Amino acid sequence: CVVPCSFSKNEIDESINNNNIEYLPAASEAIACSIAAGLKMSGKKPIVIIQSSGLSNMVSCITSLLKPYGVTFPILVSWRTYSEGDSEIQHKHLSKELPNLISSLGYQKEILDSSDLINSINQINSCNEKYKICIIEKNTFDKVELYNDRIKKTNSKISRVRYLSSLNDLYKNKDILFIGTTGHTSREMFKFMPNTNNFYMAGNMGGALSIGFGAAKSGRNVIVCGGDAEFVMHMGGLTTVGRDADEINLTYILFDNGQNKSTGGQDTYQDHLNYIGIAENAGFQVFRKPIDSI
């Protein structure tokens, strides 16, 4: 049960390649945790892989599901680092405080052995019967390439960079607040939208739309640039915003590339979703067809 991270790319890609493993991508860490709990209580052997910044999304599941019901399974958490001046500011706090957060949940913690495969397997297996989290440091695993038939084939008719550049030209120096979701979208906005008023949401995945809603409720004209994986992480925000959609000036642009691009390009497995229908049912006025030209 996985929410991708670039530090965990190699073990995630190996689980996708391996036919003996069922790879279950989850919309959020809380969902991954709940799925794993259901699997464990049904006699299966789940493993959860997440990144450190997502552990907080699991806290309620840990304290109100796993601990009171005595459910244990391996949880692998990649330890994202931070150095002063890095753009990934969302990792600053837990780059130091991750061990303390784990301890506060009543879990043991252990850094996964990167030099001894057998020992690392034993470390993971020990989590099956105790409250214990294994921490994955950067470059713990050897490089793994996804098999060609496991790589998401994209069919984008227009590049996000080109679209963002056009937004910059259209809204140059206008009183409109742009909010970019975490990952490549915000990075590309920083580079290709220099003349607009932008807020770059480096972390807090799934929260860009809700931030935009708060700004729009205060009277601002807001355009949110979101992504397909971000769309589902906290989809309740969509229904909350949709309730007041007719009373605010907010536009939500969803870039659907079918991938978690910034964490290694893993498939989001969301081809079954009708984003337009979901947004419309939540209360949004929508374009009936995806935008494929400028």
Functional labels for PLM-detected ranges:
Residues 1-213, 217-220, 269, 273-284, ...:
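Thiamine diphosphate
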Residues 44, 63, 73, 233-256:
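A short alpha/beta connector and helix-capping loop motif
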Residues 47-53, 220-241:
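DG-centered beta-turn motif at the end of beta-strands
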Residues 84-86, 258-265:
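Long, charge-dense
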Residues 136, 225-229, 255:
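Active-site flanking residues adjacent to catalytic metal/cofactor-binding acidic residues
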Residues 145, 236-238, 264:
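Short, function-defining helix-loop hinge/capping sites that tune catalysis or transport
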